[in-house]
Structure formats: structure tokens, C-alpha cells
A protein has these predicted regions:
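Transmembrane helix-loop boundary segments of multi-pass membrane transporters
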Residues: 40-44, 48, 114-117, 123-124, ...
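C-terminal membrane-solvent junction of multi-pass transporters and transport-like membrane proteins
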Residues: 344-353, 392-440
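TM-loop-TM module centered on a large, flexible mid-protein loop between adjacent transmembrane helices
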Residues: 82-85, 89, 121-130, 207-214, ...
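Helix-loop-helix junctions that connect adjacent transmembrane segments
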Residues: 5-10, 49-50, 129-146, 175-307
């Protein structure tokens, strides 16, 4: 079935700024509010954490450039499925797309859990009525009615925006990105007035936090321990190419290729400022003693600043939820077009231009989130990280092979350094994947996380088997000049 025969078509409304806010907002989210204390604990101080995030950004830049080159050359929704299919065939394309769908889709219920956790744990201290009706406990975590309802209302709003179309979702993303930046500016201002560089001393120390402790014995080991976590906190730049088919007419594709790298660099700078600002407000060894230190330290300084930051932190998860919702639906759309998922996944709503079936499936997954409890955050985090990096690595190898098999393909943007730069992306991705699967590595998945991965793979193999005799749908990728 050709593109023209598809039911409906994607709206072409997204500008370079829209793409930047989609990626940047997906990357930063509010993980920094919940995790900045853990970064310092695991690294043995804010200095080690900052160095790790710098290295992490540099590590992922070649991968971001690979996405930029391929997306500018082949700007279609869920392009990862297309790239791998053209180089390594339908089976590997399916595996890559299926795992990336897992990695991205997980972030939707993850963010819903984060909202309910902040409402119950932090707002619950201010307004005990929020914890007055307990529904049940799961994995030792209590689930309360009112925080669940509030998280559901936030999630439903994001779902509605994505059903309305890419333009509405992009407008929401722009607002949320500005809100997150306001929160960071607030933290910076407080650190300048109340804190000082002497508070980041000692440069390295083993400390005990509310829920974790430093296991590294040296600063170098601390940097490595944080470094293996950074791919998850930089995950989100891939949401930019997933919606490339909805780029506005006349978009400069050379600049588009640079947007992904810019989003990574901006996020790296954001994390640097975040870690330094919170690490210097008060002595960092005191800062990390609270359960959510980024908020707890503000509560002792000024209750109004605390409430302001808490509000920003609570609406913040809507940003990555929005970005990953849109990205995952486009991945499933691409897989439907390839015949890798049921035909209904290839259908686009004629009015809103959004993938109908994928949106419905993601809506169900997202609203389940608040009912799972906060103890599911860590397993979902690690599974998402592995799925994301595996897909990025496959895209990097596809980019390299496409340079050999399709040398004449128009490439408005190219990876700096050519094949050498692409090789660096392949190496970086492979190394991170190995760190996550080799026994003994600080980032190795545990039994629960492996069960999620293997369960998802089993479901995927069943679907693949059911569809193995179906003819792949033909879809012609538009060139940049035709988009």
C-alpha cells in the first residue's frame, strides 16, 4: 500500500523550535528533581556527578548525529524501523522497533507514577487529606486514592493533546519546557544567594543517603557508577526524529540534523547547572540526607519557594510523557506500515493526523501507571535504558552500512567526521549495552528487569510469528525535497 493509500495523512506543522522543545523536554523531565541527590551519593559528590554527565553527553553526541543524518535523509515517522529494515532486513528491523517501543512506552506510565509519588509523598506532608484513603500496597509501596486521581487527570490531559494532533502536543511541550527552565533558574538563584562553592567540598566522600549509599571507593569509580546511569537521563533525543514526517513545509533539514545534538548539549548543560546549584546550596553531605533533597532543602530555606518548586516538579513529568507518547505512537505507526504489527496500526486519523490504534494502546498503558506504585520506578527505568541504547546502537550500525550501500542517498546533514564519527557512535552504543548485560557490571539488569525484557521479547516473537506470512506493506519514504 502506498503512502497515498494510507488512511489519512500526518499534519506538517512542527518547526525547528518545536522539535527542540520535544527533545529537550523529553530528556530533562523532572528526573533531576527526584534523582539529583542520588547522583551525588552514587558518585561520592557533586563533582563526580557533573563529570559523569559531561562524559555521558559527549558519549552520546555521535549517536545523536547519526539520528540527525538519517532523519534528514529519510524524514518519516518512526524512521528507526525504516533505517534498520533497509540495511539489516525486516526481522532485525522488527526487533529494534519492538524494543524501542518498549523503551519509549515505559516512560508514559513511569511519568504518571512519578506524578502520583510527588503528590502523595511531598504534597501529602502539607495536606494529609491526600493520604486519607489508602487503596492497597504493591511491592511495599502504598497507593492512595487522591494522588492516583490527580495523576490520572494529568495523564488524561496529555492523552487528549496527543489525540488532537502534533501541533497541540507541541504547544503543551513548549509550555512545560519553559516551566522546567523556570524551576532551574529558581534553584540557581537560591544557590547564588544562600550557597557557595565551598559547599561542594569534600570533592569525594562516601556517604549514606535516605535510600542509598556510596559504593565507590575512589572518585574515578564514582564517576563510572554515575556514567552508566546517564543514558537513561539523556533518553529522549530520539523523540525528535520519530515525528520528522510532521515537519513544517520548507524546513531546513541541515539545521534539523543539528537540533538533536543541540538538545543533547543543552541537556548536558542543564544537568551540570542542576547538580552544581543543588550541591552548593548547603554542604552536599547534608543535602543528600533527605529522601527528595532537591525539595527538602528548599523547604528549610523558604516554604513558598518550596511550594513553587514542588508545583513545577509535579507538572514536569507531563513533558517527557507527552514527548514519549508521540514518539512511541509513531514507532508503532511505522511498524504497522511495514506489516510488523496489525494493519490497524498503519491507520492515521483523517482529522487530527495521529496514529489511532497506537494512541489508544498507549492511553491504556499510561493510565495504568499511577496504580503500580513507586517501587516500579527503578525496574522500569533500567529496562527502558537497555531498550533505548540497543535501538540507538542498531541505528548507528545502519547509518554506517547505508554509507556503503546507498552512497548517493541525498544527505542534507552528515555526521561530523564521516565514517569515523559513525564508528564512534557504534562503539559508544555497544559499550553501554555491554555494561548493562555483562554480569558483574554496575549496570547489569536484575532478575525482575530481565523478566520484563524477556517477557516483552516473547510477546514480540509471538506477534512476529502470527504475521510472518503477511506481505509487508510498501511505503515510499519521502525525500527532504518532497517533505
Amino acid at each position: 500500500m502506498s503512502a497515498s493509500n494510507q488512511k489519512g495523512s500526518m499534519q506538517k506543522t512542527l518547526s525547528l523550535w518545536n522539535f527542540f522543545t520535544i527533545g529537550f523536554g523529553a530528556i530533562i523531565g523532572t528526573g533531576w528533581v527526584l534523582m539529583v541527590g542520588d547522583w551525588m551519593i552514587i558518585g561520592g559528590g557533586p563533582v563526580a556527578a557533573m563529570i559523569a554527565f559531561i562524559i555521558g553527553a559527549v558519549f552520546l553526541l555521535p549517536i545523536g548525529a547519526v539520528f540527525g543524518e538519517l532523519t534528514a535523509a529519510i524524514p518519516i515517522s518512526g524512521g528507526i524501523v525504516e533505517y534498520v529494515d533497509r540495511t539489516y532486513g525486516n526481522t532485525m528491523s522488527y526487533i529494534t522497533g519492538w524494543f524501542l517501543a518498549l523503551g519509549n512506552a515505559i516512560l508514559c506510565p513511569w511519568e504518571a507514577i512519578a506524578i502520583s509519588t510527588l503528590v502523595s509523598d511531598m504534597f501529602g506532608d502539607l495536606f494529609p487529606i491526600l493520604r486519607s484513603i489508602k487503596l492497597y500496597s504493591i511491592m511495599g509501596a502504598d497507593v492512595y486514592l487522591l494522588p492516583t486521581v490527580i495523576a490520572l487527570s494529568f495523564a488524561v490531559y496529555v492523552i487528549i493533546q496527543n489525540f488532537r494532533g502534533a501541533s497541540a502536543a507541541a504547544s503543551l511541550q513548549a509550555f512545560l519546557t519553559k516551566a522546567l527552565l523556570c524551576g532551574m533558574i529558581l534553584a540557581m538563584g537560591i544557590s547564588l544567594v544562600k550557597g557557595g562553592p565551598e559547599n561542594i567540598q569534600p570533592i569525594f566522600a562516601s556517604v549514606e543517603g535516605a535510600a542509598s549509599s556510596t559504593s565507590a571507593s575512589t572518585m574515578f569509580a564514582g564517576i563510572i557508577s554515575v556514567l552508566v546511569m546517564t543514558p537513561f537521563f539523556y533518553a529522549g533525543f530520539d523523540t525528535i526524529p520519530q515525528q520528522a514526517e510532521e515537519a513544517a513545509e520548507g524546513l531546513d533539514w541541515n539545521k534539523f540534523g543539528r537540533v538533536i545534538s543541540l538538545a543533547l548539549l543543552a541537556s548536558g548543560g542543564f544537568y551540570m547547572v542542576c547538580i552544581y546549584s543543588f550541591g552548593s546550596i548547603i554542604p552536599w553531605t547534608d543535602f543528600v540526607k533527605s529522601s527528595v533533597p532537591a525539595l527538602a532543602c528548599l523547604k528549610t530555606i523558604n516554604i513558598f519557594l518550596y511550594i513553587a518548586m514542588l508545583c513545577i516538579a509535579t507538572i514536569g513529568p507531563m513533558g517527557p510523557m507527552n514527548s514519549f507518547y508521540g514518539a512511541t505512537s509513531r514507532i508503532m505507526l511505522a511498524m504497522g506500515r511495514k506489516g510488523q504489527l496489525p494493519r490497524s496500526f498503519a491507520e492515521v486519523d483523517p482529522v487530527s493526523g495521529t496514529p489511532k490504534t497506537a494512541n489508544i494502546l498507549l492511553a491504556v498503558l499510561t493510565v495504568i501507571g499511577p496504580f503500580l506504585g513507586k517501587k516500579m520506578l527503578v525496574p522500569l527505568t533500567n529496562v527502558s535504558a537497555l531498550a533505548f541504547i540497543f535501538a540507538c546502537t542498531m541505528v548507528s550500525f545502519s547509518c554506517y552500512k547505508m554509507r556503503l550501500t546507498e552512497p548517493d542517498l541525498p544527505r542534507p546533514y552528515k555526521v561530523p567526521g564521516g565514517k569515523f564519527g559513525i564508528s564512534l557512535a557504534c562503539l559508544a552504543g555497544s559499550l553501554i549495552v555491554l555494561l548493562m548485560i555483562v554480569p558483574g557490571s554496575p549496570a547489569t539488569l536484575n532478575a525482575v528487569e530481565w523478566s520484563i525484557v524477556l517477557g516483552w521479547l516473547a510477546i514480540g516473537l509471538i506477534i512476529k510469528t502470527l504475521h510472518r506470512n503477511k506481505t509487508c506493506l510498501l511505503y515510499t519514504s519521502p525525500s527532504p525535497r518532497d517533505s
